[in-house]
Amino acid sequence: MNNQVIIFDTTLRDGEQALSASLTVKEKLQIAYALERLGVDIIEAGFPVSSPGDFESVQTIAKNIKNSRVCALSRAVAKDIDAAAEALKVAEAFRIHTFISTSTIHVQDKLRRSYDDVVAMAVKAVKHARQYTDDVEFSCEDAGRTPIDNLCRMVEAAINAGARTINIPDTVGYTVPSEFGGIIQTLFNRVPNIDKAIISVHCHDDLGMSVANSIAAIQAGARQVEGTINGIGERAGNCALEEIAMIIKTRQELLGVTTGIKHDEISRTSKLVSQLCNMPIQSNKAIVGANAFSHSSGIHQDGMLKNKNTYEIMTPESIGLKNQALNLTSRSGRAAVKSHMDSMGYNENEYNLDALYEDFLKLADRKGQVFDYDLEALMHFSNLREEDDFYKLNYLSVQSGSVMATTSIKLLCGGEEKCEAAVGNGPVDALYQCIYRITGYEIVLDKFDLTAKGEGEDGLGQADIIANYKGRKYHGTGVSTDIVEASGQALLHVINSIHRADQIAQIKQKKSVATV
């Protein structure tokens, strides 16, 4: 049996379902680039038929990602499969992932069909997808609660129809490792054509078993694991891929399998997903938590000083954690900034050097010394800014006392400068009142977060907001050494997204009227 475990990442599809607001196309592309650097084999980029935004995201990622195979999800419905193929066709090679429910409760209460009908629908869907690509994956939704006879029948039929990967999801996180491993083992024992497909698993974490179930499945013969970075996902989340990768690396002698993951990219990828998704990583999380390599016990510290292996089964360096060297200042040139970006593994097509260098100089003038993590934060925020941003903050002045604060701003609105001043319950409130007055948008803030990016009193601060506008939620991000300015950038990020959506809607309406 092949000892290579395929890593299938669904952060951009299943993981995004956990977010308060959808990621933008640019945000998804940043994450896709990071997953490609990480060495992920398959990137499930979205569900194209679900929305125009998802279609565009899948299409954009398929066009730009070269070293990982891009995949799109579809129900076992022809129009879904057609939409997936249309979005993916710009890729050199791609995968279509189609699925249907197989558990008794899903078949009877959700689909309201006979099992014979469901098998026929699955076969038809796989054959339809094979018209577009040889790489078709079929998932038995809620396989963990599917009667084993029915599951074996469905798997055999899907393989005969042309599926080359069969995914066995524990959709509601119901099983335990011995049980789930037994399901995989039974499939290998009872499905006659099982050798013609790779068996994949997709485990949810409702009972905290997703990683353990996935490892049990590998031991039973599964050779693809699906999951997300940091384990983000619907309800309690998905199998955390960074944990799977490090378990396989650390216990390779026991498990006898490998992955193509570049382990020293794990920490950076985890932080990026956390930042763009506005989902903090719990400090005690395995592998990537802030305390994952901390030792506070005196007995442990004594042992570590004598021999690190006494209490450390893996090193911080193995996931890419390293001490940050300080060697960039306002006197550093573009070549020095580019050299640091190169050393961190970023390709030139992943960022705009001119925009990054401009932001770097502003930061260096403020704090004097710039670390690699500062550059990364600046790059991520710079990438989120659109060249066609209608609203841009040109000037900000704050006067704050113990009771009220006054803020004055100059805002570029499509090139025209507008000024406003306001009083509020603190500088951020006053700033937001100014922006609301100039732009005319009535926005409800659902969530406001401030987090430190980097170290020290002069470190960067990141503002994240979730805003509600006409029933739709938007995520805005801002980064600055000044948290008031970062807060303003976050709101303008949202307002520019709303403005672009309004412009697109107006164009569509004009086309519709012209057609009529």
Swiss-Prot record:
Enzyme class, top EC level, equals: transferase
What cofactor is this protein dependent on? Mn(2+)
The record's subcellular location field reads: Cytoplasm
List, alphabetically, the PANTHER family matched. Answer: 2-ISOPROPYLMALATE SYNTHASE 1, CHLOROPLASTIC-RELATED (PTHR10277:SF9), HOMOCITRATE SYNTHASE-RELATED (PTHR10277)
> Sorted alphabetically, which PROSITE patterns does this protein's record hold?
AIPM_HOMOCIT_SYNTH_1, AIPM_HOMOCIT_SYNTH_2, PYR_CT
Domain Pyruvate carboxyltransferase: start-end pairs: 5-267
The biological processes this protein is annotated with in GO are: L-leucine biosynthetic process
Similarity-based family = Belongs to the alpha-IPM synthase/homocitrate synthase family. LeuA type 1 subfamily.
**Gene Ontology CC annotations of this record:** cytosol
Q: Name one Pfam family in it.
A: HMGL-like
| Enzyme Commission (EC) number | 2.3.3.13
Q: Where is this region: Regulatory domain?
A: 392-516
What superkingdom does the record give? Bacteria
This chain belongs to the protein called 2-isopropylmalate synthase
The UniProt subunit note reads as follows:
Homodimer.
Where mainly found?
cytoplasm
Q: Which GO terms describe its molecular function?
A: 2-isopropylmalate synthase activity; acetyl-CoA C-acetyltransferase activity; manganese ion binding
The protein's job, in short, is: Catalyzes the condensation of the acetyl group of acetyl-CoA with 3-methyl-2-oxobutanoate (2-ketoisovalerate) to form 3-carboxy-3-hydroxy-4-methylpentanoate (2-isopropylmalate).
Q: Which keywords does this chain's UniProt record carry?
A: Amino-acid biosynthesis, Branched-chain amino acid biosynthesis, Cytoplasm, Leucine biosynthesis, Manganese, Metal-binding, Transferase
Q: Which residues are involved in binding Mn(2+)? A: D14, H202, H204, N238
Give the organism, scientific name: Vibrio cholerae serotype O1 (strain ATCC 39315 / El Tor Inaba N16961)
